[in-house]
């Protein structure tokens, strides 16, 4: 069945080395933890944590203004994922409040066709935990999903909270065991899954050997799938990065260097919700959020320091660049303000940062670009 009404997406950036006036207009509204993708010269973005069901588009060749496209028919969605394949936009999952309980993961898929401005609900669903927390990238007609939270554990948690009926002691008895689980006991998906829209087929592309992730930054270039950081349990991130080679029998992996500690910190706690992309042959990533000190506490056996240890959710602005030869990272600059959980797309040797959020979860509507030539970082 088809639906008509209106779609699109954003993020922010800038650096200490070069900052110029932005060349793209702000979004009509702030969008954080939404979904979007680049299709040809047009970027699409929408949904997310502000509760909007709208999507917007911007023609990057003639970027005068964002246009509202057909409204998403699947209702409000926080943290859905999306990708563009063969001229169409695909949106998967997310979580929403339902009659069953709040924050329920929705396992479904929609296709948007720009040619006639319509949405179609697809007759398919993810075979694993790729509906919330997964990261996606498209290549060769396939959409690759990396990680994702465990569907049963997540939904069950909020169903149990609803059953507690507002009793704070009962809620504490639900949340305490959950947050004290080890990372591996959250059962984030370690599988790499692909979806091929042309055939409506899901495939198992192998396993990510460095623990399941949620909210990692991912990118594909020349048959290589890059994974940067991500959450490994509630409140805990990984500083690790890895590069996978896509083959006919799935993806094989090579461990890369950890992200270095940002200025002012002794240790890199990893980031979730980072935004990155390729520019002039270089991959750069920025933003994201973590709980500084969580990793050190976890290594001491303190599982929920982000909740009980006084740690603060912290958004970041360091910009990291990958050395493709050594597999190591370095900091090449900073944005003028912190950001996370926005859309990043690569276009004309620049990385567009669209929307997102900053300190306190404030949604952002700005669109900025980053470019890096191996020596200088420029933010517009």
From Swiss-Prot:
It comes from the Bacteria. One of its GO terms (cellular component) is periplasmic space. InterPro entries: Kelch-typ_b-propeller, NANM, NanM_proteobact. It is found in: Periplasm. One of its GO terms (molecular function) is racemase and epimerase activity, acting on carbohydrates and derivatives. Kelch repeats lie at residues 42-86, 88-140, 142-176, 177-222, 225-274, 296-349, 351-380. The keyword S-adenosyl-L-methionine does not apply. It is an enzyme of class 5 (isomerase). Keywords: Carbohydrate metabolism, Isomerase, Kelch repeat, Periplasm, Repeat, Signal. Its EC number is 5.1.3.24. Belongs to the NanM family. Converts alpha-N-acetylneuranimic acid (Neu5Ac) to the beta-anomer, accelerating the equilibrium between the alpha- and beta-anomers. Probably facilitates sialidase-negative bacteria to compete successfully for limited amounts of extracellular Neu5Ac, which is likely taken up in the beta-anomer. In addition, the rapid removal of sialic acid from solution might be advantageous to the bacterium to damp down host responses. This is N-acetylneuraminate epimerase. It comes from Pasteurella multocida (strain Pm70). The gene is nanM.
